[in-house]
């Protein structure tokens, strides 16, 4: 216990280390940082009153910006939610970067406040502090009976039991939501999705609040700060210099088979070049000294894209519905990105030629999150401050400007703006808390996505007995396809689905309703038992599923492949096999089958393995190989032996196909999985080793390094045990890694797609210690190739760390995840530092 306390205190000391160390962690050794700002007449960064700030904005014709709330009513806002009566629940990160070194950032001064407009003039004039004393709160969700609030690493369920808008009860609902560390590199969002789950950025989890408890389910990792959805529940997110990505299918489908991870259908890039067009000089950015970052003193390209929103309101022109608004707080601007869809794939482009939707001449305008409002307008959360960059990445270049231009002064301010279209009157927010279920169902017909979402949430929370019959009618007979879609998901959340409603929805005129029907059919089928009524319900779905499997819409066909494996009903698997044979050229269809067969891959192969078309058709052959690979990765001796028996029973071409699939899984990109130990050589393997076909012989011979027996099955000698000092170093390294490196490289060492390469088995880490030390000391700039994948991002040097901290991090990572490399000593780090002086 004393040792752990000592380690924690060491980390605390590191967090508060001197200016010359911590504040320059963003620097790279030997990199020149010319003071380019001195060549421009940079205006003062004096704080403006909210009214003065209004004059600093330039918004495109047809729009007007208004103050919805402002200091002293708001302090350092980072996120918000509207409740059912139009009140704003704002999350305030009041300890964020209180000075250039971030000293005091661990203070428990954060809060969640409720803002109200009591006189109806459109500006919030009353503040009630719901909960205070929080450390870096970052997300909020309104749920049944209360509010979920994120305070890393805890997700609190907070309740107001007496109606005064102040939390009287605070219960730990989930531990492990967000880690303590760089703000923009930990979980955030808690965005209610169309499918009744809460989605997050910088996260691999989705959450659902049911009966007072938080359910947690794995999903795909996505985004950095902020997450949004469109009218069909598709998710959008971004990451610093990458302003917008879109998932065209629900990410949960891509992770349901741990032995076949895929990002197919995810992360579509929705921008062209990286150019931005700001309204002022932007020399005060972290890497403004780098070529291409500034254009005549103004930010030239995306560097700090933050919480986006997809427009779903009814106050702007209809042609903007589905377009994206993206804030760039480093450039004091907001982009309107026009999104178009063709053949199921999205693309995006700036709505204006070399201009932005909204710009400001005020350097302290920091739009960090955007939202759709009850009135159909876009709302802007402005953190309003000089310092935006977190201490973990501040460069000397930025630090000098912060001090010289007093960007560290005048903190604790904040604004929330509303942008109104001048062509239509803004509607007042409805008071939905007092409305009955019939009135709430009526809101599903609204053209305002916020109203539909809020009505769905309230209907699911209340779960009143009279609502399902009306919702079933809405799901099948409403004139508006969005209402039909929402009604289906509302029924799903209430447990009110039935087979006739789903069957009718599967034949709906609109493809997005058919997609929703397929998805809710999964949930419905999962609730059915073995009773006669439940069996009849399953059977009743088959005709409609058979019909939708012939759908002409490409998006619907993809959803068929994703949903059918999850629907356990008579005749569904044969329907699925026939469907995949017909549409195997679609990679999402192929992956949908493979991920959906998690745990059933062998049985499926046993049914199709002898079929000629599954051997001769290239796309079907790829599926067979992938399924064989899944069985191999399961490392189950019995199932692997059954797979080898299946291979032996096939003609030569079938043997090659299955053996090739096993080999590809056993030796991914040159790496080797841990061998599977058999008591003796499998007879089927011995038989194929005597094959007349040379290719079969080669594949079996290579496989003998993965399937082992006898002397070869003896485990390798374990790595030498760590000494007591090295073990303490390992424990310190684990804490430091989690607080810093783990934000990108992840707790499992698998890295972040498109950004941070995996550390697991990386030769850059477990190879020569000097190489690993050098990377940590100096950083690395891509492109860099790890396990056959190229990564083209930069990792800053960790020059703010002392030698003992670098040694600790490397000792931990070189021994974690079954690594066997030697620990790194402080002396090794010091030697390398001295050699470079």
Explain the meaning of each model-derived region:
Residues 7-16:
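Bacterial N-terminal signal peptides
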Residues 370, 381, 416, 733-747, ...:
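The canonical Cys-X-X-Cys-His
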Residues 402-404, 477, 751-787, 792-802:
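Gly/Gly-Pro-rich "capping" loops immediately C-terminal to redox-active cysteine motifs
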Residues 421-422, 745-751, 777, 781, ...:
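Detector for the c-type heme attachment site
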Residues 726-752, 765-778:
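Sequence/structural segment immediately N-terminal to covalent heme-attachment motifs in c-type
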